Amino acid sequence: MNVTVRFLRPFARYLVPYTFHRTRSNSYSRVLQRYVSSKVPSLPCHNKDSTSPPEQLELDGWKTTMKSSIQENGVSVVSDKDEDSLAATRELIEMWRLLGKEVPEHITEEELKTLMECASKSAKKKYLRYLYGKEMMKKAKQMKKEMKAAAREEAKRARSLEPSTGEEQRDFMFLRLWDRQTNIALGWKGVQAMQFGQPLVFDMAYDNYMKPSELQNTVSQLLESEGWNRRNVDPFHIYFCNLEVDGAYHRELVKRYGEKWDKLLLTATEKSPVDLFPKDSIIYLTADSPNVMTTFKHDKIYIIGSFVDKNTQTGTSLAKAKRQNLATECLPLDKYLQWDVGNKNLTLDQMIRILLCLKNTGNWEEALKFVPRRKHTGYLEVPEHSQAAFRKLKKTKTLNSFRKGSLNVHMWKR
């Protein structure tokens, strides 16, 4: 080994720099290779022999692809979390059912999501108890329906076994009016109302003021109101204004009507009533209005707020009408009825029946028959001279000086 070192020592000054240079160049090449490999685009090398244009990298397409892949991964993670939470909720319901608690046998995806949104365990139990009672009522109705059908079949079978006397007359001079013919006739009336009828607006901008149960109650009243209007002799042209697509109202209406929603003879729009009609022709009906309705005006557009208020949020619709500078009126309940208990907010179906009766007859006594009897004790009869004196005294400050009942106002029941 010593001999080899001695032999190579004269050549050291030539070999060592060459070795250092090779090592340094190798390190530089490795650094350059890492730098180039970390960059996605590479410099195009122009070839004189090739006639094709250089290949360019589409940065926008690459960014879109990367973002979409990230979003898909995020959506998959969120969907996995939702599925896990849904499975855990189903297991919890099954465990409570095995423990003998009141939980429904069948639950939909929407009800399951509503259950997951409950904040506390007691709220979940209350909601499951509500669904259980609803399911039991549905089962009881189905059982009654089956029992009635069985009784009808039994009666029909018994009549078929009885000997016929030949005295039964089955031919009549009047044709039978089938349900399909009735629906066609009512449909023609609805078409005429949409073309020439007086508009009646239901304001659907109150979904944020109600709980889910109150909103479902409101939609039930809307369905009943639409039915009463469709069966009337001279129906209104109903507008559902401020109805957001895929909103709470819209989802519940589509759920209730199903395929018939697109066939309804009414106008559903996201626009506000002030965008469709002039403000001077609009009257907002609210129980909190200081202006009392005297007569039904056929040239006005009446608005009814689609709002079920169980928390007694007084002044909500009146405040909205004032913000939009709309005229407001309330029904003359104190003028014709001896009010007993409860507030003066009526349901939507009661309001439309009152307005339909006023539109057709103009008689307040006939129209106010649709006010529930539990809220008043009877009608008031006011003579003409007392009405004139009352109108004069109302303009003065001496009205409060009269005792109650001094204007010859007496109550009578029908």
Swiss-Prot record:
Provide one Gene Ontology biological process annotation. Answer: mitochondrial RNA 5'-end processing
Write out the entry's keywords from A to Z: Coiled coil, Methyltransferase, Mitochondrion, Mitochondrion nucleoid, Phosphoprotein, S-adenosyl-L-methionine, Transferase, Transit peptide, tRNA processing
Q: What is this enzyme's class at the first EC digit? A: transferase
**Entry's localization field:** Mitochondrion matrix, Mitochondrion nucleoid
What the entry lists under Gene3D superfamilies is as follows: 3.40.1280.30
EC numbers listed for it are 2.1.1.-, 2.1.1.218, 2.1.1.221
The record's listing under InterPro entries reads: MT_TRM10-typ (IPR028564), MT_TRM10-typ_sf (IPR038459), Trm10_C_MTase_dom (IPR025812), tRNA_m1G_MeTrfase_euk (IPR007356), tRNA_MeTrfase_TRMD/TRM10 (IPR016009)
Transit peptide span?
Answer: 1-35
Q: Which reaction does it catalyse?
A: adenosine(9) in tRNA + S-adenosyl-L-methionine = N(1)-methyladenosine(9) in tRNA + S-adenosyl-L-homocysteine + H(+); guanosine(9) in tRNA + S-adenosyl-L-methionine = N(1)-methylguanosine(9) in tRNA + S-adenosyl-L-homocysteine + H(+); an adenosine in mRNA + S-adenosyl-L-methionine = an N(1)-methyladenosine in mRNA + S-adenosyl-L-homocysteine + H(+)
Using the record's annotation, list all stretches that form the SAM-dependent MTase TRM10-type domain.
186-378
The source's domain of life comes to Eukaryota
UniProt feature coiled coil, ranges? 133-162
Q: Which residues carry this modification: Phosphoserine?
A: S79
Q: Coiled coil as a keyword?
A: yes
Task: Extract one GO cellular component term from the record.
Answer: tRNA methyltransferase complex
Cystine links in this protein are: none
Q: How does it assemble?
A: Component of mitochondrial ribonuclease P, a complex composed of TRMT10C/MRPP1, HSD17B10/MRPP2 and PRORP/MRPP3. Interacts with HSD17B10/MRPP2; forming the MRPP1-MRPP2 subcomplex of the mitochondrial ribonuclease P complex. Interacts with GRSF1.
User: Member of which family?
Assistant: Belongs to the class IV-like SAM-binding methyltransferase superfamily. TRM10 family.
- What function is annotated for this protein? Mitochondrial tRNA N(1)-methyltransferase involved in mitochondrial tRNA maturation. Component of mitochondrial ribonuclease P, a complex composed of TRMT10C/MRPP1, HSD17B10/MRPP2 and PRORP/MRPP3, which cleaves tRNA molecules in their 5'-ends. Together with HSD17B10/MRPP2, forms a subcomplex of the mitochondrial ribonuclease P, named MRPP1-MRPP2 subcomplex, which displays functions that are independent of the ribonuclease P activity.
Q: What is this protein called?
A: tRNA methyltransferase 10 homolog C
The gene name on file is Trmt10c
